Amino acid sequence: MNTKTLIVVFLVCLLVSEVVLARRCGGRGRRIKIKKIVRKLRPIVRVMKVITRMRTSRPRPRLRPCNSSDLQTTSYQVMQPISPKLKSCPVSLAICNRKCSRRGMKGRCQRRECVCY
């Protein structure tokens, strides 16, 4: 079961148990008890709505490997662990920027080598 389903099941069980308990008490107290439960559940429902919005919003773009003839731009290869021989651009770019910033320059990944400019 996924997390959202578990949360919903838990909340429903909680609500049912509270309603049963309130019914045994009977009378006006039952309505007050149910109103309190609903107030407690509202923030949780809001959080669940935010989570579903985040999941259904447009997907984040995947990182593409460096433009090189020996690399293919398939999503399968992007998802594979990066071998030490073939590093993806963002990793190399971060390393290049660190190396070149010591010299007061910017770095660029060019054919898997750092170029300072």
Curated annotation (Swiss-Prot):
GO terms for cellular component: extracellular region. Keywords: Disulfide bond, Secreted, Signal. Expressed by the venom gland. Residues 1-22 form the signal peptide. It is found in: Secreted. Its main location: secreted. Contains 4 disulfide bonds. This is Venom protein TxLP11.
